[in-house]
Amino acid sequence: MKSITFFVFNICSILALLSHCEDNDIYSFDIVNETNWLKIAKNIFKGKSPSNFTIIPFNNTGSSNDNESNKEESVLLIRKKIKSNKNHDSSIISGDTVNGDISDLNYTASNFSDNSEDIEDNQKYPTTSYNSFNHLNSNIAFNEESEYIEINSESDLENKIKDINIKSNLEENNTMNESGKVDSKYELTGDEKCGKSLKLGNISNQTNQETITQSLSVGEILCIDLEGNAGTGYLWVLLGIHKDEPIINPENFPTKLTKKSFFSEEISVTQPKKYKIDEHDSSKNVNREIESPEQKESDSKPKKPQMQLLGGPDRMRSVIKGHKPGKYYIVYSYYRPFSPTSGANTKIIYVTVQ
C-alpha cells in the first residue's frame, strides 16, 4: 500500500505542475501490464481526440531483488491529447480519458532479461531516430540493436534497415563494427573472473565527459563497475568501440533500450548488467589504487527506492577482454534514453592492449 500511495502522490505532483502550463485534462497516466492492457487499449480506441503517447518502462535494470522476478512487466503510459485545429478556442474533447481500476495496476515490474533477445521491439521512445555507425574497412562490426524509424513502404524499410543502428557524428573509419562471421568463441557473458577492476561513479548533475586510460595484456579481463542513482531514469549503456577518439554528442545517443554486447577478433565488451557483490570476488580488491577519492567515498550502497522506476542504485558491470594488441576507445554513458541531453555522464575508457 505504501508503494501505491507513493506513486499516486508523485502522479498528483506531476499533474499539479502541468496545470500551470496547460489544461490538466490534456494528460493522463496509466500503468499498463499484462492484466489491464486490453481494457486500456479499448478505452484509447474509443476516444475521439488525437493523442501523443510516451511509454516509460519501469525499472528493470537496477534491482537485484529475486522476489521481483515473478511479477508482471509494466510500463508507464503518458497520454497527451492534441487540441483540434478546427476550433482553436474549443477545449479538448472529453469522455475518452483512459481510466482503470486501481486494483488492476501493478506498480513494480519484473527485471528485464540481460539477454538482448528478450527485449521487445516495441520498447521505443518517441524521440529522434538514429543513423548508422560508419563502417571500418575491416571484417569487424558493432552489432547494435536497430533504432526504430517510421518508413512508409516495406521496400524502403528493407533498403534502410541495414543502415539503422545508432546515429553518430563520428568521422569515417572511426567506429569499430562487429561482423556476423566472427566466431562466437570471442563472445563474453559478463560473468568472467576479473583480472583488473575499475569503478566508474562520481555522477554529476550536468552533462560531462571523462577519459580514463587503462592498459591490458592480451587475454586479460578488465571489469568496469558502474554506479548509479536510484529511480532517476538514468541508465548505463555501452555506446560503441572506436579506434580513434570519438566526438561525443548526447543528441545522437540511442533513445531505445539496448542490451547487445560487442565482440570481435580484436576486442570484446559486454553491455553493463547488474551483478551481486561476492565476498570472494577478486575485483573488490584488485587495482584499488586506480580509483579516485570521490569514487572510493561512494562505496556504500544507496538505499533502494520504494517504487522502482527506471534507473536504480545497484551496481552494473561491463567486461572488457582484448584478443589482439591495439588501442581502443570504449564509450559508456549514464543518461536518460527518453531525454539524452539531460545531464548525460559519458566515460571513455582508452584501452591499450599489449
UniProtKB/Swiss-Prot annotation:
Main location, first listed in the record: secreted
Keyword rRNA processing: no
Pfam families registered for this protein in UniProt: Inhibitor_I71
Sequence motif: BC loop, positions: 226-236
PTM text: During the liver stage, proteolytically cleaved.
Signal peptide (from-to): 1-21
Region called Disordered, residue ranges: 274-317
Keyword Secreted attributed: yes
SUPFAM superfamilies listed in its UniProt record: ICP-like
A molecular function GO annotation: cysteine-type endopeptidase inhibitor activity
Phenotypic consequence of gene deletion: No effect on parasite virulence or blood asexual growth. In the mosquito vector, ookinete formation and subsequent transformation and growth during sporogony are normal. However, hemocoel sporozoites have impaired gliding motility resulting in the failure to invade salivary glands. In the mouse host, hemocoel sporozoites fail to infect hepatocytes.
GO cellular component: extracellular region; host cell cytoplasm; microneme; transport vesicle
InterPro entries with a match to the protein in the record: Chagasin-like_sf, Prot_Inh_falstatin
Ranges annotated as biased composition (Basic and acidic residues): 275-302
Alphabetic keyword roster: Cytoplasmic vesicle, Host cytoplasm, Protease inhibitor, Secreted, Signal, Thiol protease inhibitor
Protein localization: Secreted; Cytoplasmic vesicle, Secretory vesicle, Microneme; Cytoplasmic vesicle, Secretory vesicle; Host cytoplasm
Swiss-Prot/TrEMBL domain comment: The C-terminal domain is sufficient for cysteine protease inhibition.
Family, as annotated: Belongs to the protease inhibitor I71 family.
Function: Cysteine protease inhibitor. Required for the invasion of host erythrocytes by merozoites. In the mosquito vector, essential for the gliding motility of hemocoel sporozoites and, therefore, for salivary gland invasion and the subsequent transmission from the mosquito to the mammalian host. Required for the invasion of host hepatocytes. During the liver stage, may prevent host hepatocyte cell death likely by inhibiting host cysteine proteases.
Subunit structure: Oligomer; probably composed of 10 monomers.
Name by which UniProt lists this protein: Falstatin
Gene: ICP
